[in-house]
């Protein structure tokens, strides 16, 4: 009986020791430690759909991620989903180490999973851009939005900042429900919106100034076949983001590498017009949070 009692006490003590050891490992191990493969840091990169197709996006923007990986002595993999919402979900679910997220995608991921912004992308020297509503060139719109009532309007997916969030917040602020005011649809990419306008399949579609400029410069759309009928005020540009509890030293190094690039060097590594990064903090995206609250999404 005494032997059994001693064994029982030893077993309980051993169990407590094991549980304490496991707890120590959980506390001391970073929640988002970067993966190491064959002795080298391995990073999972993801970039929002900057161009009409994922292959075009990766072709134009992979060089900046390769540069970052090379500077860190890391290997990498890179993906570009077809929707702005998808990359936010991937970041939120822990499938991305460093993500180029749209402003709204970043805010949503921050709200759900504590995602942190390190830097804001510069476009033509500024960390800002504008949301657009583009229309067919022949539309007789003199007074907006009154003259557009009943027209075919296409917005982007609900994870898209300039393609959905900002136009929807604008319409709500002036008392318009797009679903009843227009012949309304949503979920298209910017490239699809611009293409359908070019071919007369829709009357109006959302876009962003930098995306439209890029498609014009690449010869993908004819600017004479469309016109801008509405634009937003300046919005904070895309967010270079990492998961909550990402390695602090690695965060600092990534921020330093990106923000120290000259505009000339940065432009050589990215799509047309994109030429650098500036340090960022969450409060820089307050205007995006405000729009989300207007629509009851936060």
Swiss-Prot record:
Family annotation (InterPro entries): PhnD
Gene Ontology terms: cellular component: ATP-binding cassette (ABC) transporter complex
CDD domains cross-referenced by the UniProt entry: PBP2_PhnD_like
Transport listed as a keyword: yes
GO biological-process terms attached to the record: transmembrane transport
Keyword Transport found: yes
One Pfam family matching this protein: Phosphonate-bd
Keywords carried by this UniProt record: Signal, Transport
Residues spanning the signal sequence: 1-33
Sequence similarity: Belongs to the phosphate/phosphite/phosphonate binding protein family.
Role played: Probably forms part of a binding-protein-dependent hypophosphite transporter.
Family annotation (NCBIfam families): 3A0109s03R
Identification of the protein by name: Probable phosphite transport system-binding protein HtxB
Gene from which this protein is expressed: htxB
């Amino acid at each position: 009986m005494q032997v059994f009692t001693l064994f029982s006490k030893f077993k309980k003590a051993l169990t407590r020791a094991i549980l304490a050891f496991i707890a120590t490992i959980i506390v001391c191990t970073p929640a988002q430690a970067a993966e190491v493969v064959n002795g080298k840091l391995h990073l999972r990169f993801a970039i929002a759909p900057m161009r009409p197709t994922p292959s075009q996006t990766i072709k134009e923007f992979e060089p900046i991620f390769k540069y970052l990986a090379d500077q860190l002595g890391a290997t990498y993999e890179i993906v570009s989903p077809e929707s702005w919402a998808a990359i936010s979900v991937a970041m939120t679910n822990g499938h991305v180490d460093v993500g180029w997220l749209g402003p709204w995608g970043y805010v949503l991921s921050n709200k759900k999973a504590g995602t942190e912004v390190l830097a804001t992308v510069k476009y033509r020297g500024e960390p800002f851009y504008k949301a657009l509503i583009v229309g067919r060139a022949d539309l007789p719109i003199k007074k907006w939005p009154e003259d557009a009532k009943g027209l075919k309007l296409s917005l982007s997916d609900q994870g898209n900042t300039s393609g959905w969030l900002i136009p929807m917040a604008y319409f709500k602020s002036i008392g318009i429900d797009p679903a009843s005011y227009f012949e309304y649809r949503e979920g298209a990419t910017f490239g699809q919106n611009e293409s359908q306008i070019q071919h007369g399949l829709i009357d109006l579609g959302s876009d962003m100034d930098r995306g439209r400029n890029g498609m014009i410069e690449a010869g993908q759309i004819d600017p004479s076949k469309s016109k801008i009928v509405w634009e937003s005020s300046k919005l904070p540009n895309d967010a270079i983001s990492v998961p909550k509890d990402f390695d602090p030293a690695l965060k600092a190094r990534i921020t330093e590498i990106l923000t120290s690039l000259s505009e000339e060097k940065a432009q050589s590594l990215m799509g047309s017009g994109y030429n650098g990064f500036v340090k960022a903090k969450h409060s820089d995206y307050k205007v995006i949070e405000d729009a989300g609250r207007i629509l009851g999404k936060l």
